[in-house]
Amino acid sequence: MSNKDDLETAVITEATPIREDENCEPVKNFESVDQSAKSESKSEPVASTRKRPESKPSSDLETEVLPVQASQAAGKETVSKDVPQSGWGYWGSWGKSLLSSASATVATVGQGISNVIEKAETSLGIPSPSEISTEVQYATGETSAKENGNSSPMSGPFGVFSTISTAVQSTGKSVISGGLDALEFIGKKTMDVIAEGDPGFKRTKGLMNRTSTLSQVLREAKEKEELWTSNEVTMETDKKTHYGLLFDEFQGLSHLEALEMLSRESEIKVKSILNSLSGEELETLKLELEQLKEAFSLAELCEEEEEEKKGGEDFTKEITELFSQLHVSSKPEKLARARNTAYEWIRTSLAKPLKEKEEGEKQLEAENTEQINNKSIEDIHAFAIRSLAELTACSIELFHKTAALVLHGRKQEVTTIERSRALCQMTVLLCKELSCLSKEFTTCLTTAGVKEKADVLNPLITAVFLEASNSASYIQDAFQLLLPVLEISFIENKTELPEA
């Protein structure tokens, strides 16, 4: 019996490492040994079971004596050697070795990164993750110790880095927005500077900002009249009674715009000179300009407006004398000619009805005279509006030429105050002449329209007085535009006198 027990233990010790190597053939041998042990045969089955382990290589026998850990490692090596170099076994072992090497590499790299981060934290003075976590817990009132233990040591530095990146991002946004605002401000200032240097754009911007000028009002009235008359069938006949169209036809609007430009330029020059002076020089110049403005007033207009003129020769003589006091090369011949033409037409229109009444013609001839009178009412009204527009346009043209000659003429032979007084008297004379001319036209209308109804005659008379009043206001506005021209002429003349 002892021999059998020894044989069984020997077989079991030999088969044990083979089962750990997951080999199928030794298991079969173990089963055969058990069956032989159970049988009552004495020694023949044992000899057959011992032959098979002897065929194993010497390396497998040596592993049986090693400890359990060494036997497991050696068993793994024998399996890798005994398995044929094909199938899933080969690829599985290769994948395991690859994963093990990759995990080792990752661990090494992670350890190196953690070392670098720790060095960066110490050099930059960044607190450790544990300190940051304790501060956060103290601030938020967290008391969980497990969360503190499980928190990764990399979260602290990355949290600091994320905070820094957020700050940089917000700073970048503010810098970009501030830069855009600065560019917008610079662009606006640049456009303002360009606009100041561009006379065309500057003039347009000035016209948009400032109140409407006289020329603009007249041009708008002209455009409205053109639109209104364009819808009428009898445009040629209606055009004769529109003041704005007639005023532009006689070049009055063009001369008024040119006079406004000269006045605006002179006003800018005067302001710049006043800004450059200071002290006693500034006060002295202001007092002299105030005296010039007082001499430039139209106070005499109300006093002399009631006086009546007797004939055209007096007007022509007076306007010529006043113009000679300005000492300019231009003469008021065109203005006097327009005025004389209007009075001659009035005389001829009033003479026809008187002659017809004196002759005492028959009833048929009286009917013809009624038709003539009816036509003469329309003609008188149309010619009255035309004469007022022509006389006003000639007056503004005279002021424009005077301003140009004063600015660009040679040395003055007369003082600026004397010129201002002469221009003031000239303006008063022109306004009075317009009033007298309108009265002459209304008298002519009343005489020619004796048999007409009041509804037909009164609107014509009212229109003549209205246009005469408008003409006088246009002349007064043009006269006021001459004040800056005389002021800059006075300043230039004052600076030239000491040099002479």
Curated annotation (Swiss-Prot):
Transmembrane segment boundaries:
none
Keywords of the record, alphabetical order, are: Phosphoprotein
- Give the matching InterPro entries: DUF719
At what positions is Phosphoserine found? Answer: S93, S152, S215
Please tell me whether the keyword Phosphoprotein is annotated for this protein.
yes
A Pfam short name: DUF719
Chain segments carrying region Disordered? 1-82
Q: Which family does it belong to?
A: Belongs to the FAM114 family.
- UniProt-recorded name of the protein: Protein FAM114A2
* UniProt organism field: Bos taurus
